């Protein structure tokens, strides 16, 4: 057995593939279309290679899974998982943190707008 980085990477990818419940070729794709559009937006071809999209998808799924597990560990001390647990984990990555805060603020604005619309609609019915 070789101690080269390539050999280590190949053996770790084999162990990851062996640890999954589905074969590598038949696994369910979750974000293929969205990732193709994102890759195109970041300068890739309009129709990137399926292998490239699958690789990016594997990286994204692994990142989200790891982040969720870490947030769950933090939240288990309180007994429940909160959005703040995720914000705490990405606190050092300012672009991600700012984007999450922006999206959370937009979510709150939409919630308030829906609530105001529902109240107006109920007043019209009465």
From Swiss-Prot:
User: Looking at the record, which segments are called Disordered?
Assistant: 1-30
Alphabetical list of InterPro entries matching this protein: Histone-fold, TFIID_TAF13
SUPFAM superfamilies assigned = Histone-fold
Q: Name one GO biological process term.
A: seed development
Annotated compartments: Nucleus; Cell membrane
Bias (Low complexity) occurs at: 1-18
Q: Which UniProt keywords apply?
A: Activator, Cell membrane, Membrane, Nucleus, Transcription, Transcription regulation
Residue ranges of domain Histone-fold in the record: 30-74
Query: GO molecular function terms here?
Result: protein heterodimerization activity
Q: Which Gene3D superfamilies does the entry mention? A: Histone, subunit A (1.10.20.10)
Look up the signal peptide feature and give its range.
Answer: none
- Keyword Cell membrane part of the UniProt annotation: yes
Q: What happens when the gene is disrupted?
A: Embryo lethal when homozygote.
This protein's GO CC annotations: nucleus; plasma membrane
Query: CDD domains in the record, alphabetically?
Result: HFD_TAF13
UniProt keyword Cell membrane present: yes
Q: In which tissues is it expressed?
A: Expressed in roots, leaves and inflorescences.
Q: Which Pfam families match?
A: TFIID-18kDa
Give the function comment from the record: TAFs are components of the transcription factor IID (TFIID) complex that is essential for mediating regulation of RNA polymerase transcription. May be involved in polycomb repressive complex 2 (PRC2) mediated repression.
Q: How does it assemble?
A: Component of the TFIID complex. TFIID is composed of TATA binding protein (TBP) and a number of TBP-associated factors (TAFs) whose MWs range from 14-217 kDa. Interacts with TAF4B, TAF8, TAF9, TAF10, TAF11, TAF12, TAF12B and TAF14. Interacts with the members of the polycomb repressive complex 2 (PRC2) MEA and EZA1.
* Similarity section: Belongs to the TAF13 family.
- Name of the protein in question: Transcription initiation factor TFIID subunit 13
């Amino acid at each position: 057995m070789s101690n080269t980085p390539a050999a280590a990477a190949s053996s770790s990818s084999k162990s990851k593939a062996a640890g999954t419940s589905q074969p590598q070729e038949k696994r369910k794709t979750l974000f293929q279309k969205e990732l193709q559009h994102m890759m195109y937006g970041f300068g890739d071809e309009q129709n990137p290679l399926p292998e490239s999209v699958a690789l990016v998808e594997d990286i994204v799924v692994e990142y989200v899974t790891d982040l969720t597990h870490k947030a769950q560990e933090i939240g288990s001390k309180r007994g429940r998982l909160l959005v703040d647990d995720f914000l705490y984990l990405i606190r050092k990555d300012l672009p991600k943190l700012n984007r999450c805060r922006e999206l959370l603020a937009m979510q709150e604005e939409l919630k308030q707008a829906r609530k105001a619309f529902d109240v107006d609609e109920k007043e019209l019915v009465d």
